[in-house]
């Protein structure tokens, strides 16, 4: 049986962690490599870097972060943010990323997913979906939003997920824009609707406030992995506490001695 993955996410801007990471013993809470090493030691199954650098010219900083992290850590690393071309993907993989997450570029040009999967293999292509509940002609549905949730597309999230999987996406990183930052838990109906409609793993993201929310994302949302940021970054819970709690709830976890 597959093991459930717990994935901390670090937002990186100009080579620094935004909001910092509140771990005891970190020399520099703003250094993403320091944070990555700490998460690796804490038992994180994977790590996600989201590059939110405003300008494309500053991409060199995230490449340095990825390279140093790959040299220092043994867990898989996914990198997303501003990935627009096959060359962007190649460069990130060459610097040590295991997987690359694409978002807006896939929405605007679906063929990008197919090109990337054919060139690098679908196992390293993650499509990030930011979805929000929208009322249309009397009924609710989830739609895709881009540019950090600011730009609405009118695209149905479930249909889009099915489409990108058919084009070769190996994994879906699903964020509920309604829940993100609320600490009220994942949007379970959204997560389950997407997970049940496709054949590849779904990473649930957006809204984690306690450890039971992580369990619910898997058990009720049918996700295969959970991603969280602030509950780990600010020392509320450790990754190990999260994994032990999930194991006690009966979920199959990788627990290192």
Swiss-Prot record:
EC class (word): lyase
Any GO BP annotation: L-histidine biosynthetic process
UniProt subunit comment: Heterodimer of HisH and HisF.
UniProt entry tagged with the keyword Thylakoid: no
Keywords carried by this UniProt record: Amino-acid biosynthesis, Cytoplasm, Histidine biosynthesis, Lyase
Protein name: Imidazole glycerol phosphate synthase subunit HisF
Function: IGPS catalyzes the conversion of PRFAR and glutamine to IGP, AICAR and glutamate. The HisF subunit catalyzes the cyclization activity that produces IGP and AICAR from PRFAR using the ammonia provided by the HisH subunit.
GO CC annotation, single: cytoplasm
EC number(s) per entry: 4.3.2.10
Keyword Cytoplasm: yes
Catalytic reaction list: 5-[(5-phospho-1-deoxy-D-ribulos-1-ylimino)methylamino]-1-(5-phospho-beta-D-ribosyl)imidazole-4-carboxamide + L-glutamine = D-erythro-1-(imidazol-4-yl)glycerol 3-phosphate + 5-amino-1-(5-phospho-beta-D-ribosyl)imidazole-4-carboxamide + L-glutamate + H(+)
Pfam families named in the record: His_biosynth
Pathway: Amino-acid biosynthesis; L-histidine biosynthesis; L-histidine from 5-phospho-alpha-D-ribose 1-diphosphate: step 5/9
Record localization: Cytoplasm
Family as reported in the entry's similarity comment: Belongs to the HisA/HisF family.
Residue numbers annotated as active site: 11, 130
GO molecular function, one term: imidazoleglycerol-phosphate synthase activity
């Amino acid at each position: 049986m597959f093991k459930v993955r717990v994935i901390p996410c670090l937002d990186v801007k100009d080579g620094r962690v935004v909001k910092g990471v509140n771990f005891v013993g970190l020399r520099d809470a703003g250094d993403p490599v320091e944070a990555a090493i700490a998460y690796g030691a804490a038992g994180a199954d994977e790590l996600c870097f989201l590059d939110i650098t405003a300008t494309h010219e500053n991409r060199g900083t995230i490449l340095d972060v990825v390279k140093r992290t790959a040299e220092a850590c043994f867990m898989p690393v996914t990198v997303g943010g501003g990935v627009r071309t096959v060359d962007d993907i190649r460069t990130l993989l060459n610097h040590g990323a295991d997987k690359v997450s694409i978002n807006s570029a896939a929405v605007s040009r679906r063929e990008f997913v197919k090109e990337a999967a054919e060139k690098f293999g679908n196992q390293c292509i993650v499509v990030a979906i930011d979805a929000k509940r929208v009322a249309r002609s009397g009924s609710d549905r989830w739609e895709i939003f881009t540019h950090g949730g600011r730009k609405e597309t009118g695209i149905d999230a479930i249909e889009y997920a099915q489409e990108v999987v058919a084009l070769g996406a190996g994994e879906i990183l699903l964020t509920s824009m309604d829940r993100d930052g609320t600490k009220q838990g994942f949007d379970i109906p959204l997560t389950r609707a997407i997970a049940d409609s496709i054949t590849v793993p779904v990473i649930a993201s957006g809204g984690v406030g306690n450890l039971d929310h992580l369990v619910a994302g898997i058990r009720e949302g049918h996700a295969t992995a959970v991603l969280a940021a602030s509950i780990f970054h600010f020392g509320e819970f450790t990754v190990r506490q999260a994994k032990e709690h999930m194991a006690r709830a009966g979920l199959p976890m990788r627990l290192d001695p």
